[in-house]
Amino acid sequence: MGYRYLDMETYKRKNHFDYFSSLSYPYVGITVNVDITDLLQKIKAENLPFFLTVCYCVSKAANKVPEFRQRIVGDRIIEFDNCKTSHTVALEDGTYCYCTLDGNMPFCDYIVYAAREQEAAKKMNTIDEEGDEVYDKLFISTLPWVSYTSLIQPVPIPADSNPRITWGKYFVQGDRTLLPVSVLCHHALVDGIHIASFYRQLDEQILNIGKD
């Protein structure tokens, strides 16, 4: 995994970094209803897996925003070239395990690869993620049983800096189908403008999925 250290002497958000890093709860989060009308039609027409299709769009969108690829290590910031997703996979006993996926490939290849990795993850059946391997992850989850307007996520102490992205049950409003998508980020790295950029990128990925 390629990465670089940011120069803290020239980092333009140094004051913001220091301030938000000092807080006991340094996170900023929001939930936005994302239009998936056309995407859902494509999923149904091509018999695509809903979760993995959305996960691919989310992964591509997040990686388009540099701040979503940045992590705090000690008192410094590293920026990864590409971040993988770590998502929950439902198990037959009602629990779940974690599965790591790399979205840096064409969508047609990703769907085959991701389905295979999910089956392998079920056999491993673990939620352990330790050491440096966790830094380059985007934490992904879903709540497919309910539509919601806000979401509170569990976070560690001390705070980590991995973005958490979750979506719920899609619903119809008028002639559009909407999906609630939540984002939680460390405010020392990510401001509202960067979160807005993620949602714009997500709209773009949804519009153009499969055109790579």
Residue ranges of model-derived segments:
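Acyl activation and transfer enzymes in specialized metabolism, enriched
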Residues: 39-64, 179-198
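Gly/Ser/Thr-rich phosphate-binding loops and adjoining beta-strand/alpha-helix segments
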Residues: 3-6, 21-53, 69-83, 137-140, ...
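Helical lid/core segments from catalytic subdomains that handle acyl or acyl-like groups
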Residues: 91-146
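Charged, conformationally dynamic linker/hinge segments
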Residues: 174-176, 203-212
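Histidine-centered acyl-transfer/condensation active-site motif
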Residues: 132-145, 163-200
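Hydrophobic/aromatic-rich structural module bridging two neighboring secondary-structure elements via a short loop
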Residues: 63-100
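Acyl-group handling in specialized metabolite and lipid biosynthesis
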Residues: 30-32, 39-45, 96-108, 190
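Short amphipathic alpha-helices and their capping loops
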Residues: 1-22, 84-90, 153
